[in-house]
Amino acid sequence: MSQIEFKDVSKVYPNGHVGLKDINLNIEKGDFAVIVGLSGAGKSTLLRSVNRLHDISKGDITIEGQSITKARGKKLLEMRRSIGMIFQHFNLVKRSTVLRNVLSGRVGYHPTWKMILGLFPKEDKVKALDALERVNILDKYDQRSDQLSGGQQQRISIARALCQEPTIILADEPVASLDPLTTKQVMDDLKKINEELGITILINLHFVDLAKEYGSRIIGLRAGELVYDGPASEANDEVFNHIYGRSIKDDEKLGVE
């Protein structure tokens, strides 16, 4: 049984734009799967449909054999606990401390009123500190998040996702706003988490070099359709040209040196 399965999934927006068209795709446990394609190809729509940030129009998506598409209420909350999310723009509470931001990864486990009052049990704080140590910013735990660099803020986001104790992490263009050196550090963190903890990574990336360097698998989308799914080791220039429908530009190859 695949960890994530897309079954005939389509997404049509209210304005008639087709975001996804008849997607059939299996993501296996432990994959580091990179989604690539032009802007507007459906990468974010595909990624965000996994945890229902975007609802699909047709088909079904299952997590560990259970339909998240049909899940409601407590069942949906329970399924979302296992899916961490990392965004391009970090989505941190800038005035809060690093530790408090990471602890927000535990909100799905406790009543809302306790989270508003900051009543996190000791066990949660231990989990949060462990997550910060894993991404090498434990020493920043008591600083305000907006006092840190972009790369450090993205590492807070990764730690927050880890604090959730997920089996899957979705990463939506997590390095798009970072410089090359910081990009490498963040991608190294994600790869280490994938390899050491066995957490499945499903990630959107703009740079094809990064996709080949870090991915175990490449998923190519064009105009909402799945046009490639195969090992990263087999994804050569011809494959990427097919995915993009044209030759790859230099600024799409800028990756880790």
UniProtKB/Swiss-Prot annotation:
It is found in: Cell membrane. One of its GO terms (molecular function) is ATP binding. Its EC number is 7.3.2.2. InterPro entries: AAA+_ATPase, ABC_transporter-like_ATP-bd, ABC_transporter-like_CS, ABC_transpr_PhnC, MetN_ABC_transporter-like, P-loop_NTPase. The complex is composed of two ATP-binding proteins (PhnC), two transmembrane proteins (PhnE) and a solute-binding protein (PhnD). Belongs to the ABC transporter superfamily. Phosphonates importer (TC 3.A.1.9.1) family. This is Phosphonates import ATP-binding protein PhnC.
